[in-house]
Amino acid sequence: MAPAMEEIRQAQRAEGPAAVLAIGTSTPPNALYQADYPDYYFRITKSEHLTELKEKFKRMCDKSMIKKRYMYLTEEILKENPNICAFMAPSLDARQDIVVTEVPKLAKEAAVRAIKEWGHPKSRITHLIFCTTSGIDMPGADYQLTRLLGLRPSVNRFMLYQQGCFAGGTVLRLAKDLAENNAGARVLVVCSEITAVTFRGPSESHLDSLVGQALFGDGAAAIIVGSDPDSATERPLFQLVSASQTILPESEGAIDGHLREIGLTFHLLKDVPGLISKNIQKCLLDAFKPLGVHDWNSIFWIAHPGGPAILDQVEIKLGLKAEKLAASRSVLAEYGNMSSACVLFILDEMRRRSAEAGQATTGEGLEWGVLFGFGPGLTVETIVLRSVPIAGAE
């Protein structure tokens, strides 16, 4: 009996490691340029009389290293919903009405692109992981996306709500476990974020809220994850070698988010960049010890760009060369902080710029890489990646 059970269990598992097989991204069409945003933001929220606060906000935007962001909320929508523009006005119903529809729709655009690149029928998708910090509903966004895409009713769904900015790592960790423990599994992973839950007017007494208004943008990213790829029809982009999560010491309350009648509020209560840079070396040592890697400039980097200060302090603390965080900085500049979707956008940017530069691998010509998610807790997700050779590269 026991040997038969062991054979069954072995047959249920994949032979090789999980790999990212395709990536797709999407944004709303409404682009907002950071240089113009302070004037727009204070006008649309009827806050132009707060001249000193507007100057502070301009400085925040100037230091953000963001060029543009995309937002579903247009001027027309905001004019129709004045409570969303006010500071701390009851507005959850209006916000929910937007996100329960628009979060799955934006997710669909990214998923369609990922499925197209993968090149297989969507009926082969066995699992769906959906992640958002933008609203909550039942049945969830995972159900809505299943219907929008026409996935099989028997697809195994997982819905992650309210995880925050580390969750791009969380979904990879979960997808890795699903792909490696279910032979033949093909996991569709989607992160979709819309700032309609967090947008609000300024207040002189809550500058941490203003920081979020300068940083956050909308976006959705989708990937297909599977083990034992078909060499004839599937092209792996990155292998998921290991995945771990940890809570940083003495970081309780560093980032808090609370869903209330006024929407989702974020509070930055401690030196977040300092806490991350102080602890990141240990995360790296724990993750790369089995591989014998100790030179952090010898690996490629995908780090959640919560803000420029996080990237700057990590770079200084580890003595990283400027180009190491180039892909992360590029996504921050072009899209802002899209919470859980950010690191998947950076994965896409990494493979794209590696190919365009004629690099030998999807990881800037290097073999090993790291993906970091940082968020409430403070929680850190650490994913060790292995790149794959780029066809035709010298």
From Swiss-Prot:
InterPro entries in the cross-refs: Chalcone/stilbene_synt_C, Chalcone/stilbene_synt_N, Chalcone/stilbene_synthase_AS, Polyketide_synthase_type-III, Thiolase-like
Molecular function in Gene Ontology: naringenin-chalcone synthase activity
Keywords attached to this entry: Acyltransferase, Flavonoid biosynthesis, Transferase
Broad class of enzyme this protein falls into: transferase
Pathway(s) it belongs to: Secondary metabolite biosynthesis; flavonoid biosynthesis
EC number(s) reported in the record: 2.3.1.74
Pfam families registered for this protein in UniProt: Chal_sti_synt_C, Chal_sti_synt_N
Gene3D superfamilies, per the entry: 3.40.47.10
Keyword Transmembrane helix (UniProt): no
Keyword Transferase annotated: yes
GO biological process: flavonoid biosynthetic process; polyketide biosynthetic process
Catalytic activity from the UniProt record: (E)-4-coumaroyl-CoA + 3 malonyl-CoA + 3 H(+) = 2',4,4',6'-tetrahydroxychalcone + 3 CO2 + 4 CoA
Active-site feature positions: C165
Function: The primary product of this enzyme is 4,2',4',6'-tetrahydroxychalcone (also termed naringenin-chalcone or chalcone) which can under specific conditions spontaneously isomerize into naringenin.
Protein name: Chalcone synthase 4
Lineage of the species this protein comes from: Eukaryota, Viridiplantae, Streptophyta, Embryophyta, Tracheophyta
Gene that encodes the chain: CHS4
